Amino acid sequence: MLLSGIARQSRVKTTPGVIIIEGVALSEIESTLTGARLPFMMFRRIAAVLLSLCLFGLGTTASSRYMSVDEVKPGMDGVGRTVFQGTTVEDFKVHIIGLLRNTNGPKRDLILARIEGGPLARTGVIAGMSGSPVYIDGRLLGAVSYSLGQFATEAIAGITPIEEMIDATTGPDAAAPVKRRPPPVPMTAAGIAAAFDHATSPVEPFASSSAHVSYTGLAGAYDGRTATALRPIATPLVAAGFDVDAIQPILQLFERAGFILAPGGAGATIGAATTQPGPMGPLRPGDPIGVALITGDLSFGATGTVTEIDGDRVYAFGHPFYNVGLTRFPMTRAYVHTVLPSLLNSIKLTSIGDVVGTIQQDRATAVSGTLGAGPRTVAVHVALERVGRPRRTFTFQVADDPLLTPLLVYTALYNTLSQHERDYGAATYSLRGRTAIRGQADVDLDEIFAGDQPGVSAAAAVAAPLGVLLNNDREPIDIESIDLSIDATEHPLTATIERAWVDATAIRPGRTVPLKIVLRTWRGDDALYTVPIPIPLNADDTLTLLVTDGPRLAQWETRDGRPAVGPDTAAGLIRRLNDTRHNNRIYVRLLGRNGGAIVASETLPGLPASVLSVMEGDRAGGGGASLQQATLGAWEIRTSMAVSGQRTLTLSLDGRGQQP
């Protein structure tokens, strides 16, 4: 009676290493026992019972927090939590159907369940629910993360076990980056997309057609078509400030990985406001959460739902974001404007908010991160000018990731140009700027792009060096900022190399001869340039003068074997990028017949034949690369136009002059 009285007015709570008997103070228990003047043996029995209660509480705290898949039985009922509108977490019912063993890979199980409540009867499983926690008897089972079928009459979902979410994302949150395939230089929009597509090439957990599967582990209850329908819940993309055409290349790549653009998310104001009404309070399981890829004057990211918060550790989604492993994406709050019902794919219309932490792991069964200050991002500043219009400035922050950063910068810059300048018709962009790198020299940008869609080329020229830098296999590189100044004009500022000649009657070693170059501008006018060419004293009897544009010079250098040996250091890589041939230059090369070599990224022209023979024998060991011709002199002339064309002159030093 005495013990039952204490039990009736109290409740035992436990936390790791702590026992709390609510409603009864220890002094009260002591006074009750001593005041009752119990015999010694009775006192021992009561103490033993209390001790057993305490030990029982201690033994169940760690294991009772999460429910193992081994405990799951068909017919169990639970409750899920998510936000259908605003920031209010609402409950929905969960009815367990069964367990699919090894469905998502070896020792990667999925729990099948029917969900109901709120708008689910008319929406089915909703894009944006990924990560919604499911509890059975107060214990966390996992995250709603997969949907079954399209045009389904019932909301049937797959639940990723919480233990697998924690297991997949447990480990160091920082490691040496994995080398990915960098985009080519020079590059195009298609080149950026191809590099991104090749680097990801996701291995989907479920087949894309019924011909690829015949059995799913449902004990014959369903045929092979089940596997084509069981997929991760689509992840809503939030895009504010973007034109649909400008965002299309990156959108196609994300859609292939299971993302879906929220209606009105591009080219409209939905999601543009990143501030939500009133304070949102601390992050909770069931709250919407965002992964921000671009913030600032543009906004681009994705949203899901928080599954679990353990201290400052956050688990969400229940399936991958893009399954890129270690990440440094900003974690943000999110706001649900409403749910758009659809027989094909219902979706939460969301916007991303303030940064509350860092997404550090993107794995097959979850994304996870840490609450606190957000990660370092790449700051992009753009100043856009055109005659007759005021100067415009744009600033946005881009997620720092070897794979995504070049693609995001390209998309943001192209979108900015297409939104504020003409998208079609003749135009010219004069681009100057720099990419600042921590602890290294800047990468300089100086190009002119003219034609019907120069914005594509301008954006690609900025993104290309980023892909090379971030994916180099020499040493890590941190991009700090990108500062750009762009002058726009609605005229095609182009020029062609029309003529080139040496204005001298005799060409002898030791003399300087004038090289004349005529450019024919887009208006039909001629522009004359003069370059003094000193002839070396030890020059061959016959020399070659190459007058060319930047792209053709790069092609010639490739044929001559000059890029065969890559730089050994990040500094060497930056020097190589700064030596990239520009399309607003006239390049002149004086070439001799005696070749040279490239050693440790340095060009050595005019080497003796004996040295070249030794180097050729050592070429297989990576000792260097031979050159077919020796460069005896190099000049470049900067112009205010995009230059194209090439002229080659053969110079004879015996007094006969030149042969075009």
Enumerate the language-model features and the residues they cover.
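Terminal presequence/propeptide segments associated with secretion/organelle targeting
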Residues: G59-P660
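Small side chains
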Residues: G5, G57-G59
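Bacterial N-terminal signal peptides
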Residues: A48-G57
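Alpha-helical transmembrane segments and their juxtamembrane interfaces
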Residues: G23, C54-L55, G86
